[in-house]
Amino acid sequence: MPYAPDLLLVNANVLTMDPARPRASAVAVAGGRIVGVGDNAAEVAGGARARDVLDLKGATLIPGFHDAHNHMIGFGLSLTEIDLRVDSLDELYARVAARAAATPAGEWIIGAGYDQTKTGAHPHRDALDRVAPGHRVWLKHASSHMCVVNSLVLRDLGIDVTAPQVDGGRVAADASGRPTGLMEERAQELVGDLTRPYPLARLTDAVATAGETYLREGLTSVTEAGVGGGWIGQSPVELAAYVAAREQGRLHVRAELMVISDAFHALTAHPSDGIEIGIDLGLRTGFGDDWLRLGPMKIFTDGSLLGRTAAMSAPYDGDPGNGDSNNKGYLQADAGHLTQTIIAAHQAGWRVAAHAIGDGAIDLALDAFDAAASKHPRRDPRHRIEHFAAARQDQVARAAALGVIPVGQGRFATEIGDGMLAAVGPDRHPWLYRQRSLLDAGVVLPGSSDRPVVTGTPLLGIHDMVNRRTASGAPFNAGEAITAEEALRAYTWGSAYASKAEHVKGSVEAGKLADFTILSEDPTAVSPDRIAGLEVIATIVDGEVRYDARG
């Protein structure tokens, strides 16, 4: 070792995620990198005296948690919105009324997190008018794939009397044709046109406040699942909020940013370059550094299971969700357009993250990736399918053969699992959020939450990946449960692999980034029902203690 370590961690139970050395008790850090791992602290430190020594007294040290699908700015913004995770419409309306009473007339009332499978129905514009007179009201669904607004908003949009047709979305209406206030998928862009873009200062604050929560939960890296446009982006210059947060010392965790496909446009590059679409200057996946980097292009192919808008090959079970007993959901754009966009982004050198929840949409994504590889061969493009929620067994095998990474959310089981089980019906329960099938097929499994759709604490995610129970206690496709070791690997090395960053993070090995999460106990050694209750003692990023629960 050429110089003394900055930090030496000793008396630790180190779970390295390195098959060559699964466990250790000491780790040395210098210059933000791991420089030694082993069981002899003196040897790990290279015989030198470390500047700081941290005695972990038997606590468990793991690679820092990495959430592979997380809406960081969306979560930061949600912290100032009404929490609508309630079990009845009466409670929802009461919370809206309380916020309205405390808000100056004319200001927006914004809430998030309601689930009609728990409240019994979607909120209605007329009820919102009564509880929040004089305010524009915008309530976001738990899935983020739909929202409800009141009459003032509908009037601003010029659609308070009749519902327009929206490509890739729907403005719901009652039997008389009058809009109810419910807006699905791309119809939400109409509301966004009234409220966005948000000021960069507000978005920068959202990055910072979200990061503070993440540190408390042991997160050291996130993949932001869509910036720059469409119904999910907050501003066309959203990346600048992350840059500003970093310049101000308020980017607390490492961030990889997916760029939404709406931000892509035709580029007049030289024909030999093969770059037909992209973002300006030819920036693409991989641009940046270990703190802030451009990730894949994010493209939405369909919607959500909770909202019954995901594109399925057969109709939804029970309540169709939109009055159509043959409802199979829908794609968010023409299939040919979606396919060509994926192929063009692949050709231009981007990794692609295709949101595909229903098995019909998954077929489209797999077909597009197959066509892209055939037309424009690339070595290990490592494309992704976000969610891969209702996947047939043949689709598991095909994803494995294509080298596509399905990025699921085990965390969904507890918070919204009951609603998804009801949506697909018993015959398709075995399709839901596969884990065991993917691992058995040789696919690398990442860990992610889709926060703020659900509470994104990684330990809760690991708990759900192992236990697979809904809020009501029902099994959530229990045959797809995995072990604590496998779930922990997913939230560390697996997520790094999904970001094509396993060479710099995801395991405790010499040369890798010094990002660690320190836990009160070993998640692989406690009973499965105790995983959620473990404590994050400290979070270390870049070799520095960024969070210490014990001062």
What are these regions (language model features)?
Residues 99, 213, 497-498, 539, ...:
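Short alpha-helical functional segments enriched in proximate histidine and acidic residues
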Residues 205, 340-353, 357-383, 387-388, ...:
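His/Asp/Glu-enriched, well-ordered alpha-helical/loop segment
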Residues 36-37, 111, 516-519, 548:
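A generic structural signal for residues embedded in beta-strands
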